[in-house]
Amino acid sequence: MSLKCGIVGLPNVGKSTLFNCLSSAKAQAANFPFCTIEPNVGVITVPDERLTKLAELVHPGRIVPATCEIVDIAGLVKGASKGEGLGNKFLGNIRETDAIIHVLRCFEDENITHVDGTIDPIRDKEIIDTELQLKDLETIEGRLAKTEKAAAAGNKDAKLEVSVLKAYKEVLEQGKNARIVEFDTKDEQDCARNLFLLTAKPVLYVCNVSEAEAKSGNALTQKVEALAKEEGAESMVIAAKTEEDIAELESYEDKQLFLEELGLEESGVNRLIKKAYALLNLETFITAGEMEVKAWTYKKGWKAPQCAGVIHTDFEKGFIRAEVIKYDDYIQYGSEAAVREAGKMGIEGKDYVVQDGDIMHFRFNV
């Protein structure tokens, strides 16, 4: 299971700088891979210190972390929903992502002009929101024109879709995002998911600030944080230019020293990647052996057979049981054998809900 996040924002808010920081994330852990698929697409690793600690005990041939695909989506201007600027390309690219990282400018710099002349992250947010909402309304109206005829003829599925579409339409016409709409039944939720509405995607608002404000933010970031809470969205503060400087440092020690001088325990890039991972309700289980220590991504709440299927579909089809070691137990006892001896290995069936950090070994037969 892969995670794909799109970075969006108006011109000159620091979007490309942030993408460059993320693209340099490989330098923070030399063993972890990074590759560029296209000039504006990168695959970066999800930071997880548990893998390194397990590797010190297991001595595997390699460490394989979870990955996240980041897409630097072309800058947006007013009228994108009508195809202005790079609008159609922008909206096509964002539709393919799982979550949105929305960069908002919260710093003053007379050398970097703002497209609207002043610094106002709330206004900037609303510009992009409006364009996405208009595109979603266009999508909904097109679907309604087709679906209402089938619903009138008595088609049960069409009736369900019409009710979902109208619920979204009502909210969007009020200038609100589709993600605030909640559906009670699984059928409604599945129908809503299959519409792939832009404003239904989870969003992380990233407030780009100056180096001096990297730790605590400022009055503008506080406004964004308050608005994000109202929406049920996430927000964070990052100094993208400073993160770019940190990424250029060669040694891990120099990076940590720089962070300490700023009063930060962890780089903003690492925090952002973790937040993006959590934004989609994703967690990690681990397999640990002589060949590799590997992180596997799954949806929170998944049961053992579903997680087995992440490794291979045969594992899910022929699932017998899962041998589970809690991460803390593995670290405490130092090896799988010692965990077994201590009676700390769990033998779990098909109803076991996998927990973040579980070290799993699946038994199956096909």
Regions found by a protein language model. Name each.
Residues 1-113, 141-142, 146-147:
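Conserved G1/Walker A P-loop phosphate-binding module
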Residues 76-82, 117-132, 151-156, 212, ...:
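Flexible beta-alpha connector loops of hexameric P-loop NTPases
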Residues 24-25, 50-51, 75-77, 105-111, ...:
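Conserved nucleotide-binding/hydrolysis micro-motifs of P-loop NTPases
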Residues 30-31, 112-116, 217-219, 249:
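Short amphipathic alpha-helical segments
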Residues 2-8, 13, 19, 146-353, ...:
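C-terminal-of-GTPase-core extension/linker across diverse P-loop GTPases
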Residues 95, 99-102, 107-135, 139-142, ...:
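Switch/coupling subdomain of P-loop NTPase systems
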Residues 34, 48-51, 64-70, 84-98, ...:
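Amphipathic alpha-helical transducer elements in NTP-driven molecular machines
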